[in-house]
């Protein structure tokens, strides 16, 4: 695997004389190291150069913030959770619980396959879509009714934590 050349947002080679250089240290200070690293991984398709812009880095900083907020939500809603709750059998789980665990398994398979083939951009894309669109936008919202008065609060806490931990493990190589 040979890494790509990083170009500006117009596809031009970065050059000090052209004045189109994006200083990675400045971007790390402004948006965070994780956001810059994930941006580069997300756009590093095999055989293609990376068109980098500050807006793209900012977008992945927003992704990092979304994950941070999801983590805070999960951790703030673990009151009374002692970590001993075992997952219920599949037929006893709610539809939302079965759905998110199914999507987690599919995402895990997709990420592992992409990493084995050195397709880091595909792995990053799968992780991004799962965390943003499915875990944060859907499952966290669906879980609120279970957490705030539902009969399966402990099961919901367990699944929230399990999926969050899995997401963080997905992100570890990035």
Predicted regions and their residues:
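Short secondary-structure boundary/capping segments
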Residues: 15-22, 54-57
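Helix-rich, typically C-terminal accessory recognition domains appended to large enzymatic cores
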Residues: 26-174
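Active-site and channel-lining beta-strand-loop segments
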Residues: 1-19
């Amino acid at each position: 695997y040979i890494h790509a050349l990083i170009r500006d947002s117009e596809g031009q080679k970065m050059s000090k004389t052209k004045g189109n250089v994006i200083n990675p240290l400045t971007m790390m200070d402004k948006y965070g190291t994780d956001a810059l690293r994930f941006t580069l991984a997300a756009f590093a398709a095999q055989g293609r150069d990376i068109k980098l812009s500050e807006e793209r880095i900012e977008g992945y900083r927003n992704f990092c913030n979304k994950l941070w907020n999801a983590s805070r939500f999960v951790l703030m809603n673990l009151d009374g959770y002692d970590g001993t709750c075992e997952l219920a059998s599949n037929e006893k789980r709610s539809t939302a619980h079965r759905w998110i665990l199914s999507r987690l398994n599919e995402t895990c398979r997709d990420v592992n396959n992409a990493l084995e083939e050195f397709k880091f951009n595909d792995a990053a894309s799968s992780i991004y879509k799962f965390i943003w669109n499915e875990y944060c936008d859907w499952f966290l919202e669906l879980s609120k009714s279970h957490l705030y008065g539902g009969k399966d609060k402990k099961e919901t806490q367990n699944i929230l934590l399990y999926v969050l931990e899995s997401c963080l493990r997905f992100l570890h190589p990035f």
